UniProtKB/Swiss-Prot annotation:
It comes from Arisaema tortuosum. The gene is matK. Coiled coil: none annotated. Usually encoded in the trnK tRNA gene intron. Probably assists in splicing its own and other chloroplast group II introns. This is Maturase K. GO terms for molecular function: RNA binding. Keywords: Chloroplast, mRNA processing, Plastid, RNA-binding, tRNA processing. It is found in: Plastid, Chloroplast. Its main location: plastid. The keyword Phosphoprotein does not apply. GO terms for biological process: mRNA processing; RNA splicing; tRNA processing. One of its GO terms (cellular component) is chloroplast.
Length: 512
């Protein structure tokens, strides 16, 4: 990193952020695959399964590839053959992966330098465990949503044209050759379906081949989509606010990839923004799904919807489906967020009041934010993972049958504990208990299948030791967190507990 910083300091005297020559430096591709970028406390993120430097990635191959990319005969050949490029016998994806990995490291450099300089001013380096937990959003929901009236369930629009992505990057990097290469690279090796595709209805999936570059592009695109919120907050910042807070430091890829949290609470905008007068608004996003809640009327939320649709269409030059923004009242609406099914139901309550010798009942209504485990999507997720069938009946997992008994039980127990940890904030535990039951019985059937025995014989052989693997660890954690609580364990499990060490959504819960 010091070498890269020194190179950039020299380049700034010629042209700001002149990054193109770095594509031909050998150490760039070593950095792209080196574990040194992914040690604890690193500002970069890269999944461990794509780590490891491959000697086939070299700057010489990159130089030859870029030269052929700009040759007209190569372009003709590439359009005639979608699977093979100018290098005979090599797959096109090999070279696209090579360039994208090197380019991903290069485009991160200006952002990392900006982060390092800001950290030097603050004299502190953030650790991954200190990043804000995604579970911290739910206490915010519990505190705020019960006082609001309307909610907009928003799916960030797609697709966006490849040229728009280049223009977004151009706002951050003024290196023209690099931008030209990025534009050519997109149109030569990828179409939009390969770049960012909606694998599920509410979040974006990225290319598995080049996750680093596409995570960077996705975050740049989302920041641009949400720029209207930052603009509106700046317009109202001089006005009196009942509560206000922003967490814009999460917007960049290297600090927290999956979460960008913005909270807006203000009384009144200036007259030029008459459309949004008196919008007591809260906005939260995770991946491609966002929630916009307001204390205003349904008409106000329709105005917000119209404004968002028009802004996205005019700014990104594509049609944004209005159906991707769903507006509803809190009293009759449930929304999926971070694997939970959340709602704010109206609970009727009768209060007995007594004055002197007479007494009477007062009917009142209370609102409380409820978060439960969505059992039907969870069963679908467990079914895809081969723990049960589509009806929720547990089945054995034959791919694990070759493991030892202890390894099988340990794997199932770990999955069960992780789900219990993630869904500890559920207000109703029945769905969580059913998921545990499916995993326990699936584990028993897997071990019984391995020994060609029955589930009953397996349970009789292990007895309580088998259940301890699924329950005792959770009981120990709760006893450490709440040591002074004297409630029975079954009452303790009814309480909602939000763990602030969870920084990403559980894989089995990521079905929404």
């Amino acid at each position: 990193m010091e070498e890269l910083r020194g190179y950039l300091e020299k380049s700034r005297s010629i042209q700001q952020h002149f990054l193109y020559p770095l594509l031909f430096q050998e150490y760039i591709y070593a950095l792209a695959h080196n574990h040194g970028l992914n040690v604890n406390g690193s500002i970069f993120y890269e999944p461990p399964e794509i780590s490891g430097y491959d000697k086939k990635f070299s700057s010489l191959l990159v130089k030859r590839l870029i030269t052929r990319m700009y040759q007209q005969n190569y372009l003709i050949n590439s359009f005639n053959d979608s699977n093979q490029n100018g290098f005979v016998g090599h797959n096109k994806n090999f070279y696209s992966q090579m360039i994208s990995e090197g380019f991903a490291v290069i485009v991160e450099i200006p952002f990392s330098l900006r982060l390092v300089s800001s950290l030097e001013e603050k004299k502190e380096i953030p650790k991954s465990q200190n990043l804000r937990s995604i579970h911290s959003i739910f206490p915010f929901f519990e505190d705020k949503l019960s006082h609001l009236n309307c909610i907009s369930d928003i799916l960030i629009p797609y697709p966006v044209h490849l040229e728009i992505l280049v223009q977004i990057i151009q706002c951050w990097i003024q290196d023209v050759p690099s931008l030209h290469l990025l534009r050519f690279f997109f149109h030569e090796f990828y179409n939009w379906n390969n770049l960012i595709t909606p694998k599920k209805s509410n979040y974006y999936g990225f290319s598995k081949e080049n996750p680093r570059l596409f995570l960077f592009l996705y975050n740049s695109y989302v920041v641009e989509c949400e720029s209207i919120l930052v603009f509106l907050r700046k317009q109202s910042s001089y006005l009196r606010s009942t509560s206000s807070g922003t967490f814009l430091e999460r917007t960049h890829f290297y600090e927290k990839i999956e979460q960008h949290l913005v909270v807006l609470c203000c009384n009144d905008f200036k007259k030029t923004l008459w459309l949004f007068k008196d919008p007591f608004i809260h906005y939260v996003r995770y991946q491609g799904k966002s929630i916009l809640a307001s204390k205003g009327t349904h008409l106000l939320m329709k105005k917000w919807k119209s404004y968002f649709v028009n802004f996205w269409q005019c700014h990104f030059h594509f049609w944004s489906q209005p159906s991707r923004i769903h507006i509803s009242q809190f009293s009759n609406f449930s929304f999926y967020f971070l694997g939970y099914l959340s709602s704010v139901p109206l609970n009727p309550l009768a209060v007995k009041s007594q004055m002197l010798e007479s007494s009477f009942l007062i009917d009142t209504v209370t609102k409380k934010c409820e978060t439960i485990v969505p059992i039907i999507p969870m069963i679908g997720s467990l079914s895809k993972a081969k723990f049960c069938n589509v009806s929720g009946n547990p089945i054995s997992k034959p791919v694990w049958a070759d493991l030892s008994d202890s390894d099988i039980i340990d794997r199932f127990g770990r999955i069960c504990r992780n789900l219990s940890h993630y869904y500890s904030g559920s207000s109703k535990k029945q769905s969580l208990y059913r998921i545990k039951y499916i995993l326990r019985l699936s584990c028993a059937r897997t071990v019984a299948r391995k020994h060609k025995s029955t589930v009953r014989a397996f349970l009789q052989r292990l007895g309580s030791e088998f259940l301890e693997e699924f329950f005792m660890e959770e009981e120990k954690v709760l006893s450490l967190i709440l040591p002074r609580i004297s409630y029975p364990l079954h009452k303790l499990y009814r309480e909602r507990i939000w763990y602030l060490d969870i920084i990403r959504i559980n894989d089995l819960a990521n079905h929404l």
